[in-house]
Amino acid sequence: MQIFVEKIENPSQEFWIWKKEITNRQTGGIYPSAISNVGSGISAAIYQKDEAGHVTQIAQLQLPDYEKLVEYYSAGKEINLNYIYIDDFAWLGDELPYEVESLPYTEREGFSARCALLNNHGEPAYFHIMQSKLKKGDMDFSYSGFFNLNLDLCNLSVEQGNLVFDFARFDHSNISVGMIACGGNPYFSPEISFSYIKADTVKIDTMLMSQSLSLDFLCAKTSNTTISLDPLPTTFKEICFVKAAANTVTITNAEIDTVDIREAHIDSLAFKRCKFLEYAEIGGHIQELHIDDCINAAVWKLSVPQAQTLTLSGTINTGRICFTDFVSAIPPLTAASSSDPAQLLMLKENFRQTGEYENEDICHLYFQRSKTKCERNRLKKAGRYMLDGISGYGTKPFRMLLVILAVIVLFGTLYYCAPFLSFHGASTWLEHIYASGITFFAVGYGDLFPLNTITKMVSLTEAFLGVTSTSYFLVLLSRKVIR
């Protein structure tokens, strides 16, 4: 994609970006009406050429007066870049970001660039506003466009506002935000807002935050984009990805009060070494969800029916985890449990505390199956497989009832068919089934009894199986009923 600029006559000083409704001449008060205070008075039509060769006008903006811009920036005056097209960033200085980190803060009256277009068409360029203290207003980039640019906003203090990128567009750019302090405003608490942005082939990073802020990606639409959020050493107040679309979102080393990710379309969402403090709701079309090595002291509500991967490896839960549809979460959870069965044990204890006993049994069953797969002693492994088969490791009592009936029928048929086994008073198959039943349950009416030693030994074996099997069945059944 290429950007072309053509100077035009514009006596009415009407400017717009993306569509003609986003203009300084609108009457609804939604878009900024004030134009730049560092403009040159020269207007330009901005065209975009796509890969197919189609050329479309995307904006009509003013070109800046770079000498005036340098003067204002150096003196810390208020800079308004509304409806400005910028493709030269020398006015920011030639220092690299790491070279200005040790410099003292520069006090600035204000800085905004709403409905602006910042395009780098040459060597890699940095748009870095660093080591600055803004006295009034938001640092606002709403509706602006960033093309082929490295945007660095670090060591900033926005004393009476927030950092805002609402409705901005990013293309082949890197955004790095760190050490930001926002004072908020009467309408919003301190936050960094990327609401309704559009991004293609972009990387967004936050790191080394100096204040507990909220991050808002409401309805953000991105492709080929990676979002990495790390607030260390501070916390995030709230993280919002409601109705957002993203490829990869990774949140690390964060203490988070509230997480709101509803109706989102995210290929891979990962929380690593995070601590959840109050409430977290995660739902939508999320292909991979990783919550690893985290501490949950909050209430989670998870609704990820289409997740192909779901891991809770190394996570400690002291809060509550609620699944809207746990059945759909079983396949990805059990696939991940082969490497860390303890996550199923953690969920089992969670469901026991919340009274979701069916889900508790499911977790117990798959946890025990994972342990069986890891068992190296063949004899123990065979015993565990048998326990799974007859009762699902204690979670399926009616399977045990079928086993009891099958054993009675098996011994009755053996008594009937084996010539060396005989009972007094039994001649037909049903009578031998009856003999097997009273032996199994140790009833002992006295109407039937074994006639030889071999029959007595076999009956003794069946009686032992009957006592143990019946006791086991009653324990499993009472556990189900009492709960």
Protein language model annotation of sequence segments:
Residues 2-381:
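N-terminal leader/targeting and pre-domain segments
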Residues 336, 349-352, 399, 403, ...:
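Generic alpha-helical structural element
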Residues 355, 371, 409, 418-421, ...:
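Alpha-helix capping/termination and helix-coil
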Residues 360, 414, 477:
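Hydrophobic, well-ordered secondary-structure elements that form the walls
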Residues 366, 413, 417, 464-467, ...:
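Generic, well-ordered alpha-helical scaffold segments in large soluble proteins
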Residues 380-449:
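Core alpha-helical transmembrane segments of integral membrane proteins
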Residues 423-483:
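Pore domain of cation channels
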